[in-house]
Amino acid sequence: MNDNCIFCAIINKKVPAEIIFEDDQFIAFKDIHPIASVHVLIVPKTHFESINDIPDEDSTSLSNLFIYAKKIAKQLGLYESGYRLLINTGKDGGQTIPHLHVHILTGKINIPDQGK
């Protein structure tokens, strides 16, 4: 855990969030600034700053992230109609929170201008 990370604070229940799923590996909650009609974040409880920080030999963490994304999409009723998974990595990739997370999005998506 990282004391300066908002997602770690949500995991530790120090910051409120609208949690839709949680187990010992992941937490999923609604984005407080949604860019689509459905915008959920899936966050590993292990603090990785980005996908680049997952060790190559740790394929389980990454595969589980996508398995959970599929399960949560099904729970939200998006499985049949479709959804988008998005991972932003690094500043130029649009990452604003330095804790690995996957966005589940559906509907019209409004990606804000990032000053580029």
Give the location of each predicted region.
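HIT superfamily nucleotide-processing domains
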Residues: 1-116
